[in-house]
Amino acid sequence: MKLSIKTLSGAIMTSMTLVTQSAFSQTIGPLAQEHVVVYESPDPASIYCYTPGIARLNSGRLVATMDRGGRGVKKGDPAGKVFTSDDGGRSWTHRAGFPFVHARPFVAGRSLYVLGQARDLMVIRSDDNGVTWSAPAKLTEDQSWHQSACNVHYANGCVYLVMERRVTGDIKSWGVGEMAPVLMRGKLGADLTRRENWTFASELSFRNTIPNVEKDPAIDFFGVPFFPAPYPRGSLPAPRRNSAPIGWLETNVVQFKDPDHMWFDPKGKTFHLWARAHTGGTGYAAIAKVVEHDDGSMTTTLETVPSGKKILFVPCPGGQMRFHVLYDEPTRLFWLLSSQATDSMTRADRLDADRFNLPNNERHRLQLHFSKNMVDWCFAGLVAMGATPKESRHYASMAVDGGDLVVLSRSGDARAKSAHDGNLITFHRVKNFRSLVY
């Protein structure tokens, strides 16, 4: 039988239409909507759940950390909590409390650590896989630090992580404009509860990155800041909705291993800091670089592009909120867990009451991307989402568990006080995450 080009073309178009209709008739849902509650607030109106952190031990044990805030937390009751799971996250055992916040768990040598801040940096150590813990040890004196449970990086026989110091204390609003992300390095076999076993990079405060940032930042053409954000108090785009002076916070550390990458260092002595960009807009992260010197010291500066121009902001889906970066060696890809913005252009004075603060501050859709270079991102899927903007799924941490990603989320349900002040810490599992690569 002979088929004309016209007949063949019509048959192909009909087939494509049927395939398309079939594809769109299927509901595309989140990758890991089902969850296990690791911690639930006993009083959602006065006790809030923050800073989920997760690590996997070589034994397969999962370690989770979180902290609590709000007027309902009794004085003297440790804000932080450690949990472990030996059944893949289906059930959790409370192991210890600790008197600091903004912490994350990590392994170094044969020990497990949790490092955070109670203004000063503090750390605890376990030598039995999280069952028992040392007394808290201070790493600084009379300083003011900040962070979230961002990533850790291993290289050169050391562990690297970032904490952020508030260096001036003169912003009378949210102080991210005066924060300096500080890369910290510790030897894997050393006792990391001792200050002398850590090396701190030099400090670069955000207020020292953009000329005239305090009055009229010398930066234009892509809307930074989005709302007026003058020092020292910022502005109110609408009642009870604050636009603090622009800044960076909640910083991850990455290292480029691809020799073709523009910022690859064959000596392995250059690290890059990827931070949440508080600008009032969406879709950008703020970055800096840290270079290790032969004497072991580390210097923090801005990165440059081939034109010689400095680069401070890069494309990053969800970069306006806390995000988590994980490098996966088998795929040689960076994985990004972040908050998806869907409605950042609604006027601040017309936002629904259950929307938290500024229009770019959506917190109820947790998304996953992958990238070969930390700039060009491919969407892998929604991880989980709340039923309403108040029911958050955000500030999540992740770790690799075999072929899966395990995720710990700062979450809320209908009882939560707000999208920011949630009442749950939830565990999620993205199965066979490497199959999402295309």
Spans of model-derived segments:
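Positively charged n-region of N-terminal signal peptides that target proteins for export
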Residues: 1-6
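Intrinsically disordered, low-complexity Ser/Thr- and Pro-rich stretches
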Residues: 7-9, 80
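Bacterial N-terminal signal peptides
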Residues: 9-19
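Beta-rich carbohydrate-recognition and catalytic domains
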Residues: 24-148, 153-250, 254-317, 328-333, ...
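Catalytic cores of secreted/periplasmic lytic hydrolases that degrade extracellular macromolecules
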Residues: 325
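Active-site pocket scaffolds in enzymes
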Residues: 381, 394-395
